[in-house]
């Protein structure tokens, strides 16, 4: 039997294997045992611990059988203890008679008191499993159709298994914890409540004024923040009273609104002054056509300017394709920061505004525009920049000539007007400056003299496109190294100026 086990299990050790060996009495009965010592050499003797607490050595030549192997090749003697399965449960029986011809064994089950007849293949010399000693299993009824698996399933009934928690519930708890944490750290919880009684309009105006430089008339240089005296446009939503920036100590002081304010608000003293804008570099596009020098802000506008004003539109569009790329260049212009507005009291604004005319050139002509009741037609703000601002759109060549409204010999503003219709009074400015004087002076002062820039030069003397000499035409494409830098970069030729 040991050789059969070794063939079945390969090179695995036989230690601990359950075997059946003859008893020491020599009556031929096989009893259940377990291998304790294996023979070191093939064909040697191995020791086994048998029932009754004694050990026996037996050779590895088949004198012992596996406890779970069929007993067809062995003879069972009367009174020998065997194990059978009856109604899904294992019972111990005693052999009464072993019939080798029919291969049947007559048994007597002591626990049930029954005489049974079973096939030899259904009889085992050792029990398959230990009997269950738990009271739960003893109380469970056994049905005739039950199998051995029912006993195994009933084992899991006595194990307390906790209920499974879904991942969604755990995620909801995590989200709830995060929400509570964020609420505990919010400014509404941390900041103290405002207990002082403050007029609502005053508080709202103070909140709106935060963050911007306010001019005399109420308009702000920072978009989105307005002063109390400005009610023309829709302001940005004010901050809440629970914001950490505004505490009860700030709102404890009461103020009286007198129209013009000369002193800043108390809560602005602790905050840093608004940062001044540094000199920024603005990229412009300059027309390289002789005696033109037009400056525009977009490349589309300068291309359209060159194409419409200098090259002209005609039928030979294939020859003029992308020709406007040679007649403009990119320049960088420094933009000076705006001068900060200086607050001025009503008493100091009594002097009338004097508009000094600029000496007109011979080609200029004066245009008298009807007085329009708008902030642009009265006066300019004192917060105007100290340098010349050239304000015009990319398509200014399609609009009217730029109109100059001089304020002083050194400070004036050029404003281009978009041609909305043929009549001048219906023109709308592209950009305007807000007023900084009282309404009485705005009604009294009107613009009487507006000097216009010279009209566009006539296109009668300009050369037809294609007649001007270029490095590309003089030297040819094959001698590109002899071209000027402007021609290499597809700009207007600087070597052959016509």
Swiss-Prot record:
Biased composition (Low complexity): 214-231
GO cellular component, one term: cytoplasm
ZnF bounds (C2H2-type): 285-310
UniProt cross-references to InterPro entries, sorted A to Z: CR1/CR2-DNA-binding_regulator, DUF4772, Znf_C2H2_type
BP terms from Gene Ontology: regulation of transcription by RNA polymerase II
Extent of motif Nuclear export signal: 171-180
SMART domains per UniProt: c-clamp
Listed Pfam families: DUF4772
Keywords assigned by UniProt, alphabetized: Cytoplasm, DNA-binding, Metal-binding, Nucleus, Transcription, Transcription regulation, Zinc, Zinc-finger
Annotated region described as Disordered, given as residue ranges: 129-165, 209-245
Ranges annotated as biased composition (Polar residues): 130-157
Membrane recorded as keyword: no
Entry annotated with the keyword Calcium: no
Cellular compartments annotated: Cytoplasm; Nucleus
Entry's Gene Ontology molecular function annotations: DNA-binding transcription factor activity; RNA polymerase II cis-regulatory region sequence-specific DNA binding; zinc ion binding
Name listed for the protein in its UniProt record: Zinc finger protein 395
């Amino acid at each position: 039997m040991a050789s059969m086990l070794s063939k079945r299990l390969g090179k695995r050790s036989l230690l601990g294997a359950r075997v059946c060996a003859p008893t020491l009495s020599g009556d031929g009965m096989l009893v259940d045992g377990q291998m304790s010592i294996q023979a070191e050499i093939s064909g040697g003797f191995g020791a086994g611990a048998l029932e009754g607490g004694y050990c026996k050595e037996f050779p590895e030549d088949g004198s012992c059988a596996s406890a779970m192997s069929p007993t067809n090749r062995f003879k069972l003697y009367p009174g020998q203890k065997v194990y059978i399965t009856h109604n899904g449960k294992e019972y111990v029986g005693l052999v009464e008679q072993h019939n080798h011809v029919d291969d049947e064994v007559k048994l007597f089950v002591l626990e049930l008191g029954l005489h049974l007849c079973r096939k030899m293949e259904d009889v085992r010399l050792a029990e398959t499993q230990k009997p269950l000693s738990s009271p739960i299993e003893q109380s469970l009824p056994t049905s005739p159709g039950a199998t051995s698996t029912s006993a195994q399933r009933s084992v899991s009934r006595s194990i307390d298994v906790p209920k499974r928690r879904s991942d969604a519930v755990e995620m909801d708890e995590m989200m709830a914890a995060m929400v509570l944490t964020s609420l505990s750290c919010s400014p509404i919880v941390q900041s103290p409540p405002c207990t002082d009684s403050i007029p609502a309009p005053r508080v709202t105006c103070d909140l709106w004024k935060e963050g911007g430089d306010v001019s005399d008339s109420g308009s702000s240089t920072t978009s989105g923040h307005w002063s109390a005296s400005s009610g023309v446009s829709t302001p940005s939503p004010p901050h809440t009273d629970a914001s950490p920036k505004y505490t009860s100590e700030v709102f404890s002081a009461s103020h009286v609104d007198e129209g013009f304010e000369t002193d800043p608000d108390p809560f602005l003293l602790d905050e840093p002054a608004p940062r001044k804008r540094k000199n920024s570099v603005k990229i412009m596009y300059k027309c390289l056509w002789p005696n033109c020098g037009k400056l525009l802000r977009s490349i589309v506008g300068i291309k359209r300017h060159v194409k419409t004003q200098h090259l002209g539109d005609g039928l030979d569009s294939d020859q003029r394709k992308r020709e406007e790329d040679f007649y403009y260049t990119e320049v960088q212009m420094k933009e000076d920061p705006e001068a900060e507005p200086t607050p001025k009291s009503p008493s100091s604004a009594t002097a009338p505004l004097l508009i000094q005319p600029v000496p007109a050139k011979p080609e200029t002509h004066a245009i008298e525009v009807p007085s329009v009741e708008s902030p642009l037609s009265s006066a300019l703000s004192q917060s105007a920049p100290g340098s010349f601002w050239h304000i015009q759109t990319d398509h200014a060549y399609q609009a009217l000539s730029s109109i100059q409204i001089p304020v002083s010999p050194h400070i004036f503003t050029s404003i281009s007007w978009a041609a909305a219709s043929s009549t001048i009074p219906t023109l709308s400015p592209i950009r305007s400056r807000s007023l900084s004087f009282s309404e009485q002076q705005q009604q009294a002062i009107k613009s009487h003299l507006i000097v216009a820039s010279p009209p566009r030069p006539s296109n009668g003397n300009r050369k037809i496109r294609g007649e001007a000499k270029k490095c590309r035409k003089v030297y040819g494409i094959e001698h590109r190294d002899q071209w000027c830098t402007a021609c290499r970069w597809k700009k207007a030729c600087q070597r052959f100026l016509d």
